[in-house]
Structures are given as C-alpha cells and as structure tokens.
C-alpha cells in the first residue's frame, strides 16, 4: 500500500474496503476523509487530485479499518449532526438518529406557551432537549439521565452549543424531578425487545444495551413513563414518546387506558410509526 494518496484514490480505496461490511460505504468514506482533512464535502470533489499528507493517509486508513470492524462512524469521529447541530458522542449513550428529529418537530408543533416547561427523560447526548432549546429559547427545559457519564456528555454538548439555559440532572426517570407542572414531557426511552436479534448486528453492537432494550417486549419503560408522567404534567399538558414502528397500536391503547386524550401517532421520514402523543386533562385518577 502506498505511503500517500490523492483524495479520489483514497475515497475509492475506502469504498472498496467498506463495501462488504457497510450499507453506507460511500457516505462512510466521505465522512471519515472529511474528518481527516477538516474540510467540507465540496472540497473533496473540487480538488480530487489533491494529495493527502503521509500522516493524513495513515490516519484515514486506521479509521477505515475501525469502520470495517463495525465501529460506528460517529464513534470514530466523536461527533454526529442532529437537527443541524453538532453533537459530541461516545459509547456511553445512543448515537442520535435522524428519525428522532420527528419527535423534535412534533414537539415544536404543539400549541405551547412561549415559556413552556418541558422535561426530557433519558436525554443521553442531550440531543432532543438541546434541539428544542435551539428553537425555543424561552422554554424552560429540564433534561435528565440516570447514567452519570451521559449527564456529563449532555452538559458538554450544552456548553459547546451555548445553550446553558437547559437544566441537566442525573435522575432515574422522575426520581430527582421536583416540578409537577410540566407543559410537555418527551422521551426516547429504551424500547427494543431484549430478545431482538438485531441487537447483535450493525452499529448497535457498540451502543449500551441499557439505552436500547426494555422488558415486556420493549414496552416496560414506555408504559412506566406514560403512567408516571400524569403526576408531573399540568392539566392540558402533553406527553410525546418515541417508539418502535410496530409498537404504536399498543402504546396508543395504553395512553387511552391511562386517561390521555387526543392520542395520535406521527410517522417518520420512512413512513413508519415513530412517535405517539397524548394530552393529559388532569381529570382522571387511574
């Protein structure tokens, strides 16, 4: 293997290396090379003949080899874009997914006051809470996670994005939450069945299982949040939960059973059921 390469050759080499192990080999190669060069995508195709330095080429090869081993690109570069914001990521929590932007969009579309109080449960990187804060500066947002390292990561992203108005706490779901007058409670909790065979495939192998799986065929945390949230929502407050595409029917039924009204599901960019919401009137004690 040569000690140096130009951009076009490096991309082609990386694609060949990754084609058998990644469904997004072209994109992976681009993202990794952009990170090595600290350039934007246009640069790659404007200057395909530009030579990489010996150090850049060596580093790029090492990163491609890690990707061949299945390590997520976001973990290799330490960053993932979400809601057009750069988030620091690591292996202590989930990598933000594009589908979760539907939850953010749905929250922003709710008829809330300009100073609404919002709680984000299981915040992980802080992606949902910080994306909302970037759009609604006056919202009073609290984000919680039970994992100490995840809380530290969310705080680092808060500082990096200059969104210090967001309160971030360590809390096992509601355990450290003292307010009981939220206008909106959002969560992307663990919702994958513990027996799901896909947990042993692809990028999720490198993410914490505790952030992915839940008991009761993946419904345990969804049901717990839906039930407990009623004690933390003000009358006419909303709950908004992300879930698996096959869980919408049962989750809607559970929300209705618990006394929520105006229960509805929103589909993601792939037309899969992704988020379900309900309005808590504060009138039924169940």
Swiss-Prot record:
S-adenosyl-L-methionine binds at residues 122-126, 145, 173, 188. Substrate binds at residues 188-191. One of its GO terms (biological process) is translational termination. Keywords: Methyltransferase, S-adenosyl-L-methionine, Transferase. Its EC number is 2.1.1.297. The keyword Transferase applies. It catalyses: L-glutaminyl-[peptide chain release factor] + S-adenosyl-L-methionine = N(5)-methyl-L-glutaminyl-[peptide chain release factor] + S-adenosyl-L-homocysteine + H(+). One of its GO terms (molecular function) is nucleic acid binding. InterPro entries: DNA_methylase_N6_adenine_CS (IPR002052), HemK-like (IPR004556), N5-glutamine_MTase (IPR050320), PrmC_N (IPR040758), RF_methyltr_PrmC (IPR019874), SAM-dependent_MTases_sf (IPR029063), Small_mtfrase_dom (IPR007848). Pfam families: MTS, PrmC_N. Methylates the class 1 translation termination release factors RF1/PrfA and RF2/PrfB on the glutamine residue of the universally conserved GGQ motif. Belongs to the protein N5-glutamine methyltransferase family. PrmC subfamily. NCBIfam families: hemK_fam, RF_mod_PrmC. This is Release factor glutamine methyltransferase. It comes from Shewanella oneidensis (strain ATCC 700550 / JCM 31522 / CIP 106686 / LMG 19005 / NCIMB 14063 / MR-1).
């Amino acid at each position: 293997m040569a000690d140096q390469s130009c951009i076009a050759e490096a991309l082609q080499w990386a694609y060949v290396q990754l084609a058998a192990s990644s469904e997004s080999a072209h994109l992976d190669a681009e993202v990794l090379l952009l990170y090595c060069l600290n350039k934007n995508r246009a640069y790659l195709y404007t200057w395909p003949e530009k030579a990489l330095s010996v150090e850049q080429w060596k580093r790029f090869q090492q990163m491609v080899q890690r990707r061949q081993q299945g390590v997520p690109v976001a973990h290799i570069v330490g960053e993932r874009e979400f809601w057009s914001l750069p988030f620091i990521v690591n292996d202590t929590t989930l990598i933000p997914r594009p589908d979760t932007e539907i939850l953010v969009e749905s929250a922003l579309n709710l008829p809330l006051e300009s100073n609404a109080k919002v709680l984000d449960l299981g915040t992980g990187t802080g992606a949902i809470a910080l994306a909302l804060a970037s759009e609604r500066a006056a919202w009073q947002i609290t984000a919680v996670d039970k994992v100490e390292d995840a809380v530290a990561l969310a705080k680092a992203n808060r500082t990096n994005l200059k969104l210090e108005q967001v309160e971030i706490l360590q809390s096992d779901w509601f355990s450290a939450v003292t307010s009981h007058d939220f206008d909106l409670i959002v969560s992307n909790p663990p919702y994958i069945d513990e027996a799901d065979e896909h947990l042993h495939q692809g990028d999720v192998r490198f993410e914490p299982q505790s952030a992915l799986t839940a008991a009761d065929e993946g419904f345990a945390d969804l049901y717990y949040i839906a039930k407990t949230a009623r004690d933390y929502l003000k009358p006419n407050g909303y709950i908004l939960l992300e879930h698996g595409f096959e869980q919408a029917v049962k989750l809607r039924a559970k929300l209705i059973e618990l006394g929520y009204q105006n229960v509805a599901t929103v589909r993601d960019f792939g037309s899969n059921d992704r988020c379900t919401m309900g309005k808590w009137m504060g009138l039924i004690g169940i």
